[in-house]
Amino acid sequence: MADEGKSYSEHDDERVNFPQRKKKGRGPFRWKYGEGNRRSGRGGSGIRSSRLEEDDGDVAMSDAQDGPRVRYNPYTTRPNRRGDAWHDRDRIHVTVRRDRAPPERGGAGTSQDGTSKNWFKITIPYGRKYDKAWLLSMIQSKCSVPFTPIEFHYENTRAQFFVEDASTASALKAVNYKILDRENRRISIIINPSAPPHTILNELKPEQVEQLKLIMSKRYDGSQQALDLKGLRSDPDLVSQNIDVVLNRRSCMAATLRVIEENIPELLSLNLSHNRLYRLDDMSSIVQKVPNLKILNLSGNELKSERELDKIKGLKLEELWLDGNSLCDTFRDQSTYIRSVVACVSAIRERFPKLLRLDGHELPPPIAFDVEAPTTLPPCKGSYFGTENLKSLVLHFLQQYYAIYDSGDRQGLLDAYHDGACCSLSIPFIPQNPARSSLAEYFKDSRNVKKLKDPTLRFRLLKHTRLNVVAFLNELPKTQHDVNSFVVDISAQTSTLPCFSVNGVFKEVDGKSRDSLRAFTRTFIAVPASNSGLCIVNDELFVRNASSEEIQRAFAMPAPTPSSSPVPTLSPEQQEMLQAFSTQSGMNLEWSQKCLQDNNWDYTRSAQAFTHLKAKGEIPEVAFMK
């Protein structure tokens, strides 16, 4: 940047001074500058970014220096394409399209130090369905060299970013198909020579950022904590300095938000009207950088869908301006528009529940429960059995089943399953890397049909016949169940087919997750067995991590040691009292003795304690197993 042959460093008489800030977000927004000649400069020169990337042709990278080869893309509608036949049907395979006018030698660019660099676009087909942090960490774990993704973004269904040298691109090429997603599909990584990303081409120089700060200081009203950036590109001071600040460019928006974050994070009102914004992806960081923002003016821009507001929905806005955007044209008239957005279930109120004014119109007060006190859920009810006979049958079955299940050798469960039994396991959907989850031991067998769409895999994960079921159960981690935590519900019953579920907690007793507490729900469908017991025909097991409350309650009351008769050291009077208490309370001898001992063998006080605890539902079902 030059002005009559002078470099920027020669203009020492013009400075921008900031107040010293020990912590971000404190102090006024003040810039002090002296008088002097305005320096001139040119910002944003070079290739101007288009709104949508123009694509033409499908290419694949063989070596970093090779030219692009045309590859057949089964999803394209363009005729007269030649290429390879479709292969690897079980893999995600979508090719990447190159820019319509690639630079010579593909991807050459110039760094700030003047050296030439090769740029490459990295594309992950269907990458939008993956979390950014998980995706990049998985790629980095498989890549032989460390890399820095530049301008990571989602475009349609794809995830894309840039790297700046051929060796990194080659290393990323080697990661292709080496990562498995949560549905056991291999992730494709396509490498493409590319022009330098727009953030590099259009990045503001340090001296231009200083000028931007100066202009923004003039537009800031400290008394209202309001910043007016209306039509910023046409600001006379910026125009006179030949600085092109286009807020729909990622680099310019990032620079602007950085200035706000460093100087006025306490900002309450921001006017971004008439800046030709057509998407808000680059504004998403405003939620963290300006958390107190109450008023936002986006009028006179080019937003086409209210879905763009999802990018900033974390803001606690009270006033929003959207008129003059294409999204408003979908409503026939202003009254229809206002009626459509004031409803609690409307698109805008869903994103900004505290909104009071829209385009200057007062909205009805939001219907919301803005109460800091936590909502108390009703207490969970105890077990439900229907009849005493069924209760005795089910509790006896569960006692036998889990005694074998926790014994270390589950082969004894063969007698508990029907020859044609089936069994499945599910764990909740894990947004982060499943392999690093504490439930990793269960992940490979999880048949969560909400996330698992492949019918072949669904069928394979369903265990059929009692031999396969018990073999599968033997592979699961060894456990110890807290029988005192069990809550049993009989949801359906016929004379020959009871269906019941049991909820509770258990801990793993060996392996990497030893002593880890899990919560489970298990649903059994059974038929009568020849030994007057039950025989399982369907077994569904759901496992998750235990909540903090479940962890606190788990194994708090140790189960009594099973015994068929009272401890022989009891006196004849105590044994007589024990038999009477067991008969009247319905509890077995072990729990009856525990209740009497806890109350110093005072029969009346023991009866009162029993009645009180039973009314509160604090006596476990195991106490009534005889």
From Swiss-Prot:
One Gene Ontology term, aspect cellular component: nucleus
Region of interest (RNA-binding (RBD)), residue spans: 2-118
Principal location listed in the UniProt entry: nucleus
Residues found modified as Omega-N-methylarginine: R42
Residues recorded with modification N-acetylalanine: A2
Pfam families hit by this protein: LRR_NXF1-5 (PF24048), NXF_NTF2 (PF22602), Tap-RNA_bind (PF09162), TAP_C (PF03943)
Domain RRM: 119-198
GO biological process: mRNA export from nucleus; poly(A)+ mRNA export from nucleus
Region (Interaction with ALYREF/THOC4 and LUZP4): 2-198
GO molecular function, one term: RNA binding
Domain NTF2: 393-543
Modified residues (3'-nitrotyrosine): Y126
TM spans (from-to): none
Official protein name in the record: Nuclear RNA export factor 1
Organism: Pongo abelii (Sumatran orangutan)
The organism's taxonomic lineage, starting at the top: Eukaryota, Metazoa, Chordata, Craniata, Vertebrata
